[in-house]
Design a protein with these regions (language model features):
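Second-shell loop/turn segments in exported
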Residues: 64-69, 130-134, 207, 312-313
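Contiguous, structured surface segment used for ligand recognition
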Residues: 21-118
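Hydrophobic h-region of N-terminal signal peptides that target proteins for export
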Residues: 12-20
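C-terminal substrate/ligand-recognition segments
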Residues: 514-535, 547-570
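Bacterial N-terminal signal peptides that target proteins for export
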Residues: 1-8
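Catalytic-core regions of glycoside hydrolase
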Residues: 41, 89-90, 96-105, 124-128, ...
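C-terminal amphipathic alpha-helical interaction region
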Residues: 561, 566, 577-727
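Active-site-adjacent substrate/metal-binding segments within catalytic domains
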Residues: 118-137, 148
Length: 727
């Protein structure tokens, strides 16, 4: 009898544990819902579906919306589908933007059933951690991770906090505190340090930063894993401090190629993987990282990103890959190597077919995952015999430097992706996005990621639904605007970097070509007109639409006026020159005012968030300088690469440069003398350096109108002002 009682208890315990395990995903999905819509928690019910294949279902049962999924990630995707297509709402990836849905939840007619077309959905780029995320706290990360889950992402790049791991490794190797922290760059530059592009720039990195990032990464990884994601952590790819040569003089350490015009003092060093020291460092790093962060056995290793390897000999490259992989599996037998393929595109003349094959086949089959990084431009799977059968992920990049240009051949990219899913081979394992920054419209990434699921939504319906959820209702004028954007404006492969106001002024320089567009600005003006006919600007997504389209129209028009200004310089027409100059200044002023209507279109948030990272006035100033530096002068030859169309930055930085340029040429033409170009450039550089090193700025928030119709009124006013001027 006693044995029977024990047996019964054991069975009940096992059943209880099984039930708990089954319900864990439901609890996670409910917690996500509570974070987004706490008032609606009783209106939804989540159910666990059987099966390994990612899938979700949505149906109405009595007075509840019932969402099923095989795991919490699939349930989140199902929740987002309901919010998008039934509640007409867009969940922002920004933490401060509330989710707006109808008071009475719409019922679901026919049951929705969807299954994933690919197993892996990847997101992020090393650069995103510099251009968008360096000052993020847990609040920002929590919303962003929820956004990733809502869009079905299950393999995010997760590189926060790795400097703390490296600090432990280099300390054990015999380096001093100041040597190690001086080897690191300033916070927003860490992505390029991690990719072995630059060392030491804006260092030394404060110890407080390292400690903060460890705490943050633990929260990030816990939440990502909770939502059924497999974070991609870093591994050792050969990048070592120059000071290591002092401790290990016999080590095979060589210089990597120079990068982006940086001086030799910032050049990176590479340890040959066949040196015994390489395996030692790899094991130290992975062991220390596992202690802090655990592992999902997928590691990002990216040697030679935008820099030349010590040799391009195929046998050398094959051996490098083979030796590097051997050190990885010696430390973690389950390891898989994830490699971005940007270098094959960026240095396509150097990375010949033979060289690419050598690197890719140096790793055993199915042990290297390739990110086909920039597929909207070049699909490398077509040039590499399907990556020589190694697994790969088709990725849409869509943005460089985090600037907000309306660019990206979105519709064409969708067609390319559909073709890849049919003809890309059995080793196409996933879909992803590798955007450099988030200061862009969300919709291209939502569009691409949704194609990972068999939802059978055609482009016309998709764009109509997008328009509806941005404005919060069915508005024909907004639908027309979005159809034009999708079919006629978003047709250009991402190559432009912002608009001309964000570039250092120069007479007849190629910056005009870099900011030009294939569409007519008159077409975009018509989009703006239709948006201004919307019934309301209450929804945040629509407010961003108004600002983004409006500032692009003004930015494009500024280019036209500037080219006219340069022609008047050559014609020596003083009166016409003055008129053009005043017009340019006026456009810049209007741009600043338009951007001031949204906190994410303002310099204030970027600087405030940077300063909040510091616990002392000195640290606050240090972080602010780094924040100012990245979005302006950057470093090396990358001046203005990360330009932003932000209120405050336009008035206090870009406009100041343009005023000097305009006034200098007006004065010179009026006096009948030539402009000293060297002196002009020196004056502009003085403005730039002074601004980067300053800690005072205009508070643009006092200019922001908080009324719900303020932006729409101002946008309509600007449209009326410029509609007859834009050609």
């Amino acid at each position: 009898m006693k044995r029977k009682s024990v047996y019964t208890c054991l069975v009940m315990l096992l059943m209880s544990l099984a039930l708990q395990a089954k319900d864990k995903d439901v609890a996670v999905a409910e917690a996500l819902l509570k974070r987004l819509l706490p008032s609606y928690i009783e209106s939804f019910q989540f159910q666990k579906l059987k099966g390994e294949k990612d899938c979700f279902t949505i149906e109405s049962v009595k007075d509840k919306i019932v969402i099923g999924g095989n795991n919490a990630n699939s349930m989140a995707m199902g929740l987002n589908h309901y919010l998008k297509y039934y509640c007409l709402t867009t969940v922002s990836w920004y933490a401060d933007i509330a989710v707006e849905i109808p008071e009475e939840l719409p019922m679901v007619g026919e049951k929705v059933v969807s299954e994933a077309r690919v197993d892996t959905r990847f997101f992020l780029n090393y650069c995103t951690y510099g251009y968008t995320m360096p000052w993020w706290q847990w609040k920002e990360w929590e919303r962003f991770i929820d956004w990733m889950a809502l869009n079905g992402i299950n393999m995010p790049l997760a590189i926060t906090g790795q400097e703390a791991v490296w600090y432990k490794v280099w300390s054990k190797m015999g380096m001093s505190d100041i040597e190690i922290r001086s080897y690191f760059t300033g916070p927003p530059y860490l992505p390029w340090h991690r990719m072995a592009n630059i060392d030491r720039w804006n260092g030394p990195l404060p110890m407080e930063w390292l400690e903060h990032q460890v705490s943050l990464q633990k929260k990030i990884l816990a939440r990502e894993r909770e939502l059924n994601m497999k974070p991609v952590l870093p591994a050792f790819a050969g990048h070592v401090p120059a000071d290591l040569k002092r401790i290990y003089p016999e080590a095979d350490i060589q210089h990597l190629g120079k990068w982006a015009g940086f001086a030799d003092a910032y050049r990176c060093n590479f340890l040959n993987p066949n040196d015994a020291l390489f395996a030692k460092i790899q094991k130290l790093f992975l062991d220390e990282q596992k202690k802090l962060f655990g592992t999902d056995h997928i590691y990002g290793l990216d040697p030679f990103n935008e820099v030349d390897p010590p040799s391009f000999e195929p046998e050398y490259l094959r051996k490098i890959a083979s030796d590097m992989y051997a050190t990885l599996t010696a430390a973690d037998p389950k390891a898989q190597w994830m490699q971005m393929t940007w270098m094959f595109y960026f240095d396509k003349d150097k990375w010949t077919s033979e060289r690419m094959k050598a690197l890719l086949t140096g790793v055993p089959q199915n042990k290297m995952i390739l990110l086909d990084y920039h597929c909207e431009n070049v699909e490398l799977w077509k040039r590499t015999e399907h990556f020589h059968n190694q697994p790969y992920i088709w990725c849409y990049l869509g943005n460089f430097g985090g600037n907000a240009t309306l660019t990206g051949n979105v519709k064409e990219s969708g067609a390319r992706l559909e073709n890849a899913l049919i003809n890309g081979g059995g080793n196409l394992k996933g879909i992803g996005s590798t955007l450099e920054g988030l200061d862009v419209m969300q919709f291209p990434y939502e569009y691409i990621l949704e194609k990972a699921w068999n939802l059978n939504v055609d482009d016309n319906k998709w764009i109509e639904c997008l328009a509806d959820r941005h404005v919060g209702c069915v508005s024909q004028s907004v639908r027309d605007s979005w159809k034009r954007l999708f079919n006629d404006i978003y047709v250009q492969v991402p190559r432009t970097l912002g608009t001309l106001p964000g570039y250092r002024p120069a007479l007849n320089k190629n910056s005009e070509k870099r900011t030009s567009n294939v569409y007519s600005n008159v077409e975009l003006l018509e989009v703006w007109r239709k948006l201004n006919e919307a019934p309301s600007d209450r929804r945040d997504a629509f407010r961003l639409d108004l600002i983004t389209v409006g500032r692009q129209v003004l930015g494009n028009y500024f280019l036209d006026v500037k080219m006219e200004f340069d022609r008047m310089v050559e014609a020596k027409d003083h009166q016409a020159l003055k008129a053009c100059g005043e017009k340019m200044k006026e456009i810049l002023n209007d741009l600043d005012k338009l951007n001031a209507f949204h906190p994410y279109c303002s310099l204030d948030k970027w600087i405030d968030d940077a300063r909040k990272m510091g616990d002392s006035p000195q640290l606050k100033d240090y972080y602010e300088k780094n924040a100012r530096n990245l979005i302006t002068t950057w470093g090396g030859s990358l001046n203005d690469y990360a330009s932003r169309s932000w209120a405050g930055l336009i008035s206090d930085y870009y406009a100041k440069r343009w005023e000097v340029y305009i006034d200098t040429f007006i004065k010179a033409v009026g006096e009948g003398v030539e402009v000293d170009q060297k002196q002009l450039e020196d004056e502009l550089k003085e403005i730039e350096e002074g601004w980067v090193n300053a800690t005072d700025r205009k508070d643009v928030r006092k200019d922001v109108h908080s009324t719900t119709d303020g932006l729409l009124s101002f946008s309509t006013f600007l449209f009326s002002k410029y509609q007859r001027l834009v050609k």
